[in-house]
Amino acid sequence: VLREEQLFTRAGNGELSSEDFLKKLGYADPVETMQDYLEHYLTLDAGFKPFAEKLGKRPGREGYDFVLLSNDVAEWNTYLMELHGLNAYFEDVIVSGQVHMRKPQESIFRYTLDRLGCSAGECVFVDNSAANLRATEKLGIRTVHFNRDGEDYEGRQVENFRELAEVLEEL
């Protein structure tokens, strides 16, 4: 398991392609393996699209510019975004496997702010990891913990997209 985690971290940092990662794990057909895993074992929360349509910025309407900041294998993220039709919901997509930095490293948060041309005070960071949230708080970014696992966190917490919409409307 440790070897698999190390290889996944390397793939998520962009040091290994998805194909090389899966070959090192012993899969004979890495492309088919990736597709099977992403299509059958990772699901999109049914609440996301209605949430994004309600709160996201649209032509002629105020709203949030959503940015995806993900620790992921670059090819997997691209595949999932296309599979679920998510590109239209995000102003930008920043993936650890493409930028060779990962959460909770301060560098990826600074990179994101610079790339977006935003100050920390203009942003709200929503994540399922308390460690990632604590790292952004140090930069002055407001945070919301998407907490479905009962993880300890002292700040704002939500368990679903309906609750997240309520919190964001209050900010």
Which residues fall in each region the model found?
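N-terminal alpha-helical segment
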Residues: 3-4, 18, 73
